A protein has these predicted regions:
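Gram-positive cell-envelope targeting signals
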Residues: 1-30, 102-103, 111-113, 154-155, ...
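Gly/Ser-enriched beta-turn/beta-hairpin loop segments
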Residues: 129-131, 217-223, 236, 278-296, ...
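C-terminal cap/linker of serine protease catalytic domains
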Residues: 98, 178-181, 318-386
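Catalytic-histidine neighborhood of serine endopeptidases
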Residues: 144-223, 233
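A conserved glycine-rich beta-strand in the N-terminal activation segment of trypsin-fold
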Residues: 96-100, 122-156, 211-213, 246, ...
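PDZ/PDZ-like groove recognition
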Residues: 226, 301, 350-442, 449-451, ...
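Collagen/collagen-like triple-helix sequence repeat recognition
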Residues: 27-93
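Active-site loop architecture of trypsin-fold serine endopeptidases
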Residues: 159-174, 235-242, 260-273, 282-308, ...
Length: 472
């Protein structure tokens, strides 16, 4: 693949000069001793063992000469009849990229989380012995550092990290949300220690000098995403070098997946694997109700306490939030995809700052259609070195008195795009509709472009009002 070749050459170019490999058909021939870029227009100079040189040009070579370019030059210079595969095996030493610098960068954006709940306590014989506070662990990433200029830094974690179905709401602040949430930045480690009984009779905890008190902003049980916040001056008092995560534009099967979490509450640690599947439905019960969640499947090892931590690609960009694992197979684990993460987080932050106390947490809309898919296929893009699955999204039925009914969607329509405020957003998978719905707000105008009876049709538009939305 083009991308892979560029990575390979980027790794071995430095070694080309350092170890002086012999690009020779046989030992008696003149061989290449080095290759350097000698200009800004893609010109490379080849140095030979007899002291001579030659040049060749690689168009658009800002990313470096590729292994295939070297192979072609080798054939031209030596006349050797060797296959590309043999050339790679003989002369090209390709090492896996070192992700240590990537991890180091991501650690600036990562916290371990402790969430405190009052819940029933049981002895070893499963007999109820009363109520007390307990602490659960997870992780979080820094999402936004005062971007909306409100003096706060916003964090993202899993909803199930800060929500406990077993919490006693009457004793836990009239809520299943943690009554206290603290975070620790990497390098400023700490953990809570029991410090006697509080005025409420429950165990109190000392979070130490490095513990950062966090405030719950809102969450979505249907996305398994929650947002926390802290005054920016408070978190920067611990470390002024914190960074918000970089967000990936996309992700692909086979791509590196680096998880940073708080396994077993033993401190932030790093594991690495790849994305196995871009779209898998899993079932979780967070609040006692089983729900289906669209997830990335990864073979990256994750453990109890990894929940809420970031999943990063090899460039250090966030591609998801780890949230679930398979207890029977450590190589099957899951993460919330980045479009759901950011869609939900932005949604929560919007409603937390809209000045309306009646709107909290996250909201989405229901278009009022049932859809099916057909014609699914994998499409490879040689320009990126990746591929993706596409499918036709077909309207199976339209519910009466809904947005879809009002704008004129019809059974049998094939949805091509959703138009939001005049901007077309392509619909190539059924889940695109729910992902985009997370980004919609009251006042947005929506319409659809569909294929109907062999023609392209644009429906009428509908301007969303808050009553079109429901809490998720």
């Amino acid at each position: 693949m083009k991308t892979a070749k560029k990575v390979a050459i980027a790794l071995l170019c430095a070694a080309t000069i350092a170890v002086v490999p012999a690009f020779a058909a046989c030992s008696s021939q003149t061989y290449v001793t080095g290759i350097t870029k000698s200009g800004t227009d893609g010109v490379y100079t080849v140095y030979y063992s007899d002291g001579s040189t030659s040049t060749f040009t690689v168009p658009n070579s800002s990313d470096g000469v590729t292994a295939e370019d070297l192979y072609n030059e080798y054939l031209e210079q030596t006349g050797d009849n060797i296959s590309y595969t043999e050339f790679l095996e003989k002369y090209m030493t390709v090492s896996a990229p070192d992700t240590s610098s990537t991890v180091a960068y991501c650690l600036q954006s990562t916290l371990k989380i402790y969430a405190e709940f009052v819940k029933p306590q049981y002895n070893d014989f499963n007999m109820f012995v009363g109520y007390d506070s307990s602490v659960y662990t997870g992780a979080a990433v820094i999402y936004d550092i005062d971007k909306i200029e409100d003096g706060y830094t916003y964090l993202i974690t899993n909803y199930h990290v800060v929500y406990l179905a077993e919490a006693n709401t009457e004793r836990n602040g009239d809520s299943n949300i943690a009554r206290a949430i603290y975070g620790y930045l990497y390098g400023s480690d700490g953990s809570p220690t029991a410090s006697g009984r509080g005025s409420d009779g429950y165990t109190s905890y000392d979070y130490g000098d490095y513990g950062i008190k966090l405030e719950y902003v809102g969450g979505s049980v249907e996305s398994d995403i929650a947002v926390l916040k802290v005054p920016t001056e408070d978190i920067k008092a611990i470390n002024e070098n914190i960074q918000a995560v970089d967000i990936a534009d996309d992700y692909h099967v086979g791509e590196t997946a680096i998880a940073i979490g708080n396994p077993e509450g033993n401190g932030l640690s790093v594991t690495q694997g790849v994305i196995s599947t871009e779209n898998e439905q899993i079932t979780l019960s967070i609040d006692g109700i089983e729900r289906a969640y669209r997830s990335l499947r990864i073979d990256t090892p994750i453990y109890s306490g990894n929940s809420g931590g970031g999943l990063f690609n090899s460039e250090g960009k966030l591609i998801g939030i780890t949230n679930a694992g398979n207890t029977d197979d450590q190589n099957i684990n899951y993460a919330v995809p980045i479009e759901i993460v950011t869609g939900t987080a932005d949604n929560i932050i919007h409603y937390a700052n809209d000045g309306d106390d009646s709107t909290t947490d996250a909201y989405s809309i229901t278009f009022g259609i049932n859809v099916t898919s057909s014609g699914a296929k994998y499409v490879y893009d040689s320009s990126t070195g990746y591929g993706e699955i596409t499918e036709n999204v077909n309207v199976y039925s339209v519910n009466a008195d809904t947005i879809a009914d009002a704008i004129g969607l019809k059974q049998g329509d094939v949805i091509k795009s959703l138009v939001v405020n005049g901007t077309e957003k392509a619909i190539t998978r059924t889940f695109n509709l729910s992902d985009i719905a997370l980004t919609l707000r009251a006042g947005d105008s929506v319409s659809f472009v569909v294929e109907r009876d062999g023609e392209t049709v644009t429906t009428s538009s509908h301007t969303l009002v808050q009553s079109d939305f429901h809490q998720i």
